[in-house]
Amino acid sequence: MKNFDTGRVQDKLINRLERQEKQQAFQRDRFFKFKLPEIHRTLSQTLLMEKIVETDNSAAFSDVLLKGLKKILKTSEFDFKYFIAPIRNLVPRPNPISLYITQYILEVVINEPDVIDVYGTDKEIYQAINKIISNINIKFERAEEKILEQLSHNSSLVPGSRDYEIALDQLFHKTMGEPTGGNPQ
């Protein structure tokens, strides 16, 4: 009797990978919604102070950068991956947000009339951006862990339940403030 491969193992693996990818995208979006003002402010200052971007109008550069950061929130997963494809092998295990911002600077910001030039290699620009994103992300993850720890002390809440999700959302908003979703002012 022949043993036919039904593909169940592959289907399970594919489903697990897709679920994992969706979870990462959800966490990335939540991080970005709550930390957009801080990312925008720190990134603008650092890129100008480290002379990675030279401009004669820093406000215009800041606005262009903000437009790119907001674009991350609105872009589809396919468009996101397509946009970072030219530099996805820049470093091993890259941060997707840092890659996106790097590519945005290399493709869009460099062509702005108020930007004189962008200095540094692709890798140097990525490393400067990734340092900022990583530092902000570490703070965000610590705050997130504290929130989850607070919820774990409440025995009436079961992870995954609707009450748990509501309590998590309320505690998140109380601790982090309201998500800006693109309005850093």
PLM features: residue spans?
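Charge-biased, low-complexity intrinsically disordered regions
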Residues: 1-24, 30, 37
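Amphipathic alpha-helical interaction surfaces
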Residues: 49, 71, 75, 107-111, ...
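Long amphipathic alpha-helical segments with strong coiled-coil/leucine-zipper propensity
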Residues: 26-112
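Short acidic, glycine/proline-enriched loop segments that cap or flank alpha-helices
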Residues: 31, 53, 93-97, 113-121, ...
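Alpha-helical oligomerization segments
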Residues: 127, 131-185
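Extended, amphipathic alpha-helical coiled-coil scaffold segments used for oligomerization/tethering
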Residues: 81, 121-124
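Helix-boundary capping/turn motifs
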Residues: 15, 76-77, 142-143
